[in-house]
Amino acid sequence: MSLVINDLLKSLHHLPLIFHMAYSDTKARYKRSMLGPLWLTLGAAVGVVGLGLVWSQLLHQERSELIPSLTIGLLLWQFISGCVIESTSTFVKQSQIIRNLQLPFFIHPIQLIVRQSITLAHNLIVLVVVLIIYPQNLGLVSILSIVGFAIVLINLLWISVMLSIIGARFRDVEQIVQALMPIIFFLTPVLYKAGHAGVNQAIIWLNPFTYFITLVRDPIFGNIPAVFVYQITIGMAIVGWGLTLIIFNRFAPRIAFWI
């Protein structure tokens, strides 16, 4: 485990570099475009408006109730799915850096999550506008969203590291994950709330992303997530990190040869 701990500590020591790389990557993607990174916000806004109008009719719900919930769910899903999908090719895309520079491996998954967090921060503008149009009774319970988001980040990091290693060894993993995520989207309470879907609730709660969405979204509307939601997500973090550390410790020396 010394290899894992050493790599992680070195990565944390390079946090300023990680933030700079994530910011530069985001900025470079929209260089010379008229709106720059605001295209991120515009894309999220179009998704919220379009899906909000359609699903409020299909689900026969008031827009004032559905759209705020949909906005948070959609922004979280874009963040989570972005981390999951891109992590399958993280080490492959950073192959030149990995081969030529002696940097810790954890830098690359952390950079991915930081970059996705920057995108999420841009998209929060959409949430602010929605909450102005459809005000919600925000209270002290809403602070639990921050705790929930921290738990989500802890889980996403081990998921990203795990998928980065597997994706470096098996290149087909990227296509498999990309094909599965649209299906998982409809099994995740993004467009609806977990208790409102007209499908088997057991299927929804077998989906780990359901817990991630619930942890962050429910407190914003004054609802404290059930105890089992915290128990399962914390348990996922403990078990997931344990498996990831074992796999990383065993296969990290081979990553440079795989890519």
Curated annotation (Swiss-Prot):
Keyword Transport: yes
Residues spanning the membrane: 35-55, 65-85, 112-134, 146-166, 179-199, 202-222, 228-248
Record keyword Kinase present: no
One MF term in the entry's GO annotations: ABC-type transporter activity
Compartments, record wording: Cell inner membrane
Keywords assigned by UniProt, alphabetized: Cell inner membrane, Cell membrane, Membrane, Polysaccharide transport, Sugar transport, Transmembrane, Transmembrane helix, Transport
GO cellular component: plasma membrane
Membrane topology field: Multi-pass membrane protein
Domain ABC transmembrane type-2: 35-248
Protein's GO biological process: lipopolysaccharide transport; polysaccharide transport
Primary location class: membrane
Similarity annotation: Belongs to the ABC-2 integral membrane protein family.
Role, per record: May form an ATP-driven O-antigen export apparatus, in association with RfbE.
Name of this chain's protein: O-antigen export system permease protein RfbD
Species classification: Bacteria, Pseudomonadati, Pseudomonadota, Gammaproteobacteria, Enterobacterales
